Amino acid sequence: MTLLVIGATGTLGRQIVRRALDEGYNVKCMVRNLRKSAFLKEWGAELIYGDLKLPESILQSFCGVTAIIDASTSRLPDPYNAEKIDLDGKIALIEAAKAAKVERFIFFSILNSEKYPDVPLMNLKSQVVDFLQKSNVKYIVFSLGGFFQGLINQYAIPILDKKSVWVTGESTPIAYIDTQDAAKLVIKSLGVPSTENRTLPLVGNPAWTSAEIIKLCEKLSGQKTQISQIPIGLLKALRRITKTLQWTWNISDRLAFAEILSSGEQFTAPMDEVYSILGIDRLEVISLEKYLQEYFGKILKVLKDITYEQGQQDNEISF
C-alpha cells in the first residue's frame, strides 16, 4: 500500500510519516518546499511537489497512491486567507482523490466543530467533512482535541524560564494526546475495514484545564509560576481589529477559536469504541502526566549537567 501524506512536516504529519515507514508502507509526501522537507526523504519517504493553493499541482502526486492522509492546515504566517487552504485546497484534494480512485481518505477535524459555525476554523472543518461525506470517496474522519507537544511551548518552557504563563481564564477541559500515539492509531485504522466512512474521536483521557496543566508542570519542575490572565473581552476586541485587515485574517480566525475556550464545554470524547475497533490497549497510550514527567526529567538533567560543567570551569579559572 502506498500512502500520500499532506502536511507531512507538521507536528502530527511527521509522526504519521515515521510510523507508516516503520510499519512498512510506501510513503509519498506532497510538500511545498523540497529543501525544508529533506528530513522526510532521509527517513525513506518520496517527496513530490504540490501546493493546496494551486489545484493544478495536486493531481500529479496521486500516481499509484492507495490512501491519502491529510494532516495539513494553514499557518499564522501564511499571507492569505485560511479558506484558501482549509476549504478550497481540501475540496480540490478530495476531488483529485475521487478522480484517482483512491481507496481511503483520512481527514482530521476538531471535536465539536459542528457546534461553532461562527468560529471560522471550526466552520471550515465542518464544511470539508460535509463535502467528504457526500463525495463517494471512502473516508475516515478523526476528531481531535489537542496535542501534548503544543503544551510544551505554552506552559512547560515559560515555567522553566521563570516567565509568566498567559491564559484566558478558560474553564474548558481539553483531552490532549501525544502525536506519536495519534499517528499509531491513524496508521492502524488503515487495515481495519470497520473504520470505513466513520467519524471517530482521537483524544487522550482525561481532559485537562489550563489550571490543572500548570499545577502539574509546577509539581514536576519544582518551580512556581506567575499566571497572567488575558481577558476574553480583549481577545474579542483584537479579533474585530484583525478582521478588518486582510493580512491579519488568519490571526483573527485563531482569536475566534480562542474565545470558545471560555465556554466551559468539554472537548473530550470516549475512546473505548476506538480502542476496541483498532485492537489497542488503552495502556499503550501515554498519559499527560507520564509525558510531562519524561520531558521535565530530561530537561532538568540537561540543566543539571550544564550547571555542573559551568561550576567545573569556574573552579579551574579560580585555581
Curated annotation (Swiss-Prot):
Q: Which Pfam families does this UniProt record tie to the protein?
A: NmrA
**Gene Ontology MF: a single term:** oxidoreductase activity
What EC identifiers does the entry list?
Answer: 1.-.-.-
InterPro entries, alphabetically?
HCF244-like (IPR044256), NAD(P)-bd_dom_sf (IPR036291), NmrA-like (IPR008030)
* Subcellular location(s) per record: Plastid, Chloroplast
A GO BP term here is: photosynthesis
Gene Ontology CC annotation, any one: photosystem II
Record flagged with keyword Chloroplast: yes
Q: Which UniProt keywords apply?
A: Chloroplast, Oxidoreductase, Photosynthesis, Photosystem II, Plastid
- What task does this protein carry out? Involved in assembly of photosystem II.
Question: Record's family?
Answer: Belongs to the NmrA-type oxidoreductase family. Ycf39 subfamily.
Spell out the PANTHER family in the cross-references: PROTEIN HIGH CHLOROPHYLL FLUORESCENCE PHENOTYPE 244, CHLOROPLASTIC, PTHR47128
Q: Mind telling me what this protein is named?
A: Photosystem II assembly factor Ycf39
User: Which species does the entry assign this protein to?
Assistant: Pyropia yezoensis
Which gene carries the instructions for this protein? ycf39
